[in-house]
Amino acid sequence: MNRILGMIFLFCLISCYAVDIIQSAKSNGCSVELVKRCQERKCASPCCRDGECHCGCK
């Protein structure tokens, strides 16, 4: 029983890690929190690229 629970926990842990990697790749290498902060900036087209917030991205 403990082995099954351990496998389920390991699967969930790996799944969460994979989702984080995919989201990071989609957001040009920026964390989800940084992307949210960039979107709150008061500029024309805020975005996050290479770990920094930029204005005017297309």
UniProtKB/Swiss-Prot annotation:
Residues 1-18 form the signal peptide. One of its GO terms (cellular component) is extracellular region. It comes from the Eukaryota. Expressed by the venom gland. It is found in: Secreted. This is U-scoloptoxin(14)-Sa1a. Its main location: secreted. GO terms for molecular function: toxin activity. Keywords: Disulfide bond, Secreted, Signal, Toxin. Contains 4 disulfide bonds. The keyword DNA repair does not apply. Belongs to the scoloptoxin-14 family.
